[in-house]
Regions:
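Long, contiguous binding/interaction regions
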Residues: 1-120
Length: 120
């Protein structure tokens, strides 16, 4: 039985879906997110977290890594565009990258850590 090609989204549909993912944007065929960090150690921890999620999902983003920033780019190469896999992995990355303990025994770090904000 031949494999079914995954549904890809057009730019209008992508823009609508990205409303659910503040900070993510569509550019040059990729959905993207810039995460700013408080420096190299935090950047590396975030890269490792993204790598773990990508490997567990078996869907791998392109990453750009600098001292205080990581850029995540997602698209489904096999499908030739943006698919549900991209949105699902983006949502999980966002959840993990911006998670902070609230209302429990965990105190959380006093550092700024990963900063949401300007996507570019």
């Amino acid at each position: 039985m031949p494999a079914t090609k995954e549904r890809t989204y057009n730019e209008t549909e992508i823009a609508e879906r990205l409303k659910e993912l503040p900070g993510w944007y569509f550019e040059d065929g990729w959905i993207r997110r810039v995460y700013k960090t408080d420096g190299w150690p935090t950047t590396l921890m975030l890269v490792n977290a993204v790598g773990y999620l990508a490997e567990a999902a078996y869907h791998h983003p392109d990453l750009t890594v600098t001292w205080g920033r990581i850029i995540v780019k997602l698209q489904n190469h096999a499908a030739g565009g943006i698919t549900d896999k991209d949105f699902e992995l983006a949502r999980k990355i966002e959840e993990v990258a911006l998670w902070r303990p609230q209302g429990g025994a965990l105190e959380g770090t006093p550092n700024k850590w990963v900063r949401p904000g300007d996507p570019k």
